From Swiss-Prot:
Gene3D superfamilies to which the protein is assigned, alphabetical: Aldehyde Dehydrogenase, Chain A, domain 1 (3.40.605.10), Aldehyde Dehydrogenase, Chain A, domain 2 (3.40.309.10)
Localization: Cytoplasm
Biological processes per GO annotation: L-proline biosynthetic process
Record keyword Cytoplasm present: yes
Protein name as catalogued: Gamma-glutamyl phosphate reductase
GO cellular component: cytoplasm
Pathway: Amino-acid biosynthesis; L-proline biosynthesis; L-glutamate 5-semialdehyde from L-glutamate: step 2/2
A single MF term (Gene Ontology): glutamate-5-semialdehyde dehydrogenase activity
Keywords associated with the record: Amino-acid biosynthesis, Cytoplasm, NADP, Oxidoreductase, Proline biosynthesis
The keyword NADP is assigned to this record: yes
InterPro entries: Ald_DH/histidinol_DH, Ald_DH_C, Ald_DH_N, Aldehyde_DH_dom, G-glutamylP_reductase_CS, Glu-5-SA_DH, GPR_dom
Organism: Aeromonas salmonicida (strain A449)
Length: 417
């Protein structure tokens, strides 16, 4: 099927989804969860093909981890779908309402956006996250995953479409672009007759390409250097636990720690403790010149190059730099592509407020790990993306962020004077 015909089918499906009840949506979501469980062996077999192809292509272990599905991860995906069922449906909810002097009852009511195009790399769970959230909000979706997860995504979409059809909904509500030709990405970005929003999920190059070539509004997000600043007053032992979690729990995640900024006054006592911990966790340290001498005990240490503090590591590598105070930490963050998730570890309330007000990130934390920037952690269910732009949506994009609104006026045969 051509992209044009896919767009037409998605638009027709979106019209139908916009009118169905929450109960119908939840019925279809339950069918998707059941079908994922029933066809788990086929899904895992498809994923095995992707992992084998990835190893043959020489992908890193961090990237292979992003691709991997196993029984536990698949069970987590199913649980996420069932979680979406329990969430409130924002469609139809009134944002606000007032009665004008002429008697017109005027309200803003949430509505689906329409057709969402999503271009993403790796992580096959994204396919289910997007489909389930779009379905709950009455949006159709057109998906283009990375070639690294081609077989996994194809099988997952087959499962979704079978469940939709069994629930009496159009299978075209979730469609997958299965042609690997990169030219189709450009064609999707210009399909503004049918597609209402583009969400790229991937690296800076993908976001730049979408922003420069799309005739459709683009949500920019997912990419950004995550920082943690250890202030002079921070509790060193508890800070190490937060740093370990932010860096090591899932280093391939976009909210994992990339750069650690340490106050100069505590560096001599704090960094040797950090080195021991990072050695245990086999983390490579990439240090600014002002930190090198204090990291001499590191098993894997190199001096930072010109672009290292602009690098989203997505693996067991950590940038380190010493700063004089919270203001210098914020200046470094502004210069080096902060915008996703950043944190300060401190017992100084004034510095905490200065950091929160000065950081331009979508999510800012005081004494907490950057790993919390996630739809599930925020209680939003799954997410379609983490937006790092100012307009429309910011941070994890859950159900509400996949809606727009319309004005609704109710009256008793009122005419305009």
């Amino acid at each position: 099927m051509s992209l044009e015909k896919m767009g037409q089918a998605a638009r027709e499906a979106a019209y139908q989804l916009a009118t169905i009840s929450t109960a119908q949506k939840n019925w279809a979501l339950a069918a998707i969860a059941d079908e994922l469980e029933a066809r788990s062996s086929q899904i895992l077999a498809a994923n095995d093909k992707d992992i084998a192809a990835g190893r043959e292509a020489g992908l890193s272990e961090a990237m292979l981890d992003r691709l991997l599905l196993n029984p536990a991860r698949l069970a987590g995906i199913v649980a996420d779908v069932r979680k979406v069922i329990t969430l409130d449906d924002p469609v139809g909810a009134e944002i606000d309402c007032r009665v004008l002097e002429n008697g017109l009852r005027l309200s803003r009511r949430r509505v689906p956006i329409g057709v969402i195009g999503v271009i993403y790399e790796a992580r096959p769970n994204v396919t289910i996250d997007i489909a389930s959230l779009c379905l709950k909000t009455g949006n159709a979706s057109m998906l283009r995953g990375g070639r690294e997860t081609f077989h996994s995504n194809l099988e997952l979409v087959r499962v979704i479409q079978a469940a939709l059809a069994a629930s009496g909904l159009p299978a075209e509500a979730v469609q997958y672009i299965d042609n690997p030709d990169r030219a189709l990405v450009g064609e999707l970005l210009r399909l503004d007759r049918y597609v209402d929003m583009i969400i790229p999920r991937g690296g800076a190059g993908l976001h730049k390409m979408c922003k420069e070539n799309s005739s459709i509004p683009v949500i920019i997000g997912g990419f950004g250097i995550s920082h943690v600043f250890v202030d002079e007053s921070a509790d060193p032992v508890r800070s190490l636990a937060v740093i370990e979690n932010a860096k090591v729990q899932r280093p391939s995640a976009c909210n994992a720690l990339d750069t650690l900024l340490v106050h100069k006054k505590i560096a001599a006592s704090f960094l040797p403790q950090l080195v021991r911990l990072m050695n245990e966790r086999q983390v490579t340290l990439v240090a600014a010149p002002n930190a090198m001498s204090l990291l001499a005990g590191a098993d894997n240490l190199c001096e930072a190059g010109p672009e290292d503090f602009d690098t989203e590591w997505l693996g067991l590598t950590l940038g380190i730099k010493l700063v004089a105070d919270v203001n210098e930490a914020l200046a470094h963050m502004r210069e080096h592509n902060a915008g996703h998730s950043d944190a300060i570890l401190t017992n100084d309330l004034a510095n905490a407020e200065r950091f929160v007000n000065g950081a331009g990130s979508a999510a800012v934390y005081v004494n907490a790990s950057t790993r919390f920037t996630d739809g599930g952690q925020f209680g939003l269910g799954a997410e379609v993306a983490v937006s790092t732009q100012m307009l429309h949506a910011r941070g994890p994009m859950g159900l509400t962020e996949l809606t727009s609104y319309k004005w609704v006026g109710l009256a008793d045969y009122l005419i305009c004077a």
